[in-house]
């Protein structure tokens, strides 16, 4: 297949979406390319920078991301700052946001999530559960957030929905099998 035909196909696939979510198990060049295409078409771009990057993420990638969802370790790598408390987390978020990202959500496990949007911070506490396996916690959170946002929920309500989904997943062993069904999250 020619490169031009391939580009048209990829662009059509992305244009059908309202949200594009990516992570870093795909080559960074591909992630950057997809983010640029989606952003150009006005599609919300969400990046979960996992697995944790081994180097700084390219500015041309970050400039095309609308929502970044790192965990604490990933936020430390991206910002170059050590996160020890809420204040250092906020400082790291401000730095990350300065790269052109309008919304940053740091997931903090049992401490909940800290979100930054429109120059405002919102802390969403975690649901209290007995965690047995955190393997799919981050992926479940990101998937839940995408579902809620695609259904028109505001950021705070979307994070609460994502947190519920993630809280359920950590009470079960395994990865995919731990992800809750929609009816379990309501």
Predicted regions and their residues:
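Generic structural signal for beta-strand residues in well-ordered domains
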Residues: 1, 13-14, 106
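Conserved beta-alpha-beta core of the PfkB/ribokinase-like small-molecule kinase fold
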Residues: 12, 18-91, 112-113
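Conserved phosphate-binding/catalytic region of the ribokinase-like
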Residues: 40, 54-55, 59, 63, ...
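Single conserved hydrophobic/aromatic residue that forms the stacking wall/gate
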Residues: 1-5, 9
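Conserved sugar-transfer catalytic core signal across GT-A, GT-B, and GT-C glycosyltransferases
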Residues: 4, 34, 130
């Amino acid at each position: 297949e020619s490169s031009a035909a391939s580009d048209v196909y990829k662009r059509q696939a992305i244009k059908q979406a309202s949200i594009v979510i990516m992570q870093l198990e795909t080559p960074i060049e591909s992630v950057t390319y997809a983010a640029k295409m989606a952003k150009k078409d006005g599609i919300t771009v969400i990046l979960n920078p996992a697995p944790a990057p081994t180097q700084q993420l390219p500015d041309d990638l970050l400039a095309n991301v609308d929502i970044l969802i790192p965990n604490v370790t990933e936020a430390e790598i991206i910002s170059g700052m050590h996160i020890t408390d809420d204040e250092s987390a906020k400082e790291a978020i401000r730095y990350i946001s300065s790269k052109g990202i309008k919304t940053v959500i740091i997931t903090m496990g049992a401490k909940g999530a800290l979100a930054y949007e429109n120059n405002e911070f919102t802390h969403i506490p975690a649901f209290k559960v007995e965690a047995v396996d955190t393997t799919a916690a981050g992926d479940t959170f990101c998937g839940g957030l995408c579902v809620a946002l695609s259904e028109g929920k505001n950021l705070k309500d979307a994070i609460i929905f994502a947190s519920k989904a993630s809280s359920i997943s950590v009470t079960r062993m395994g990865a995919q099998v731990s992800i809750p069904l929609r009816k379990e999250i309501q």
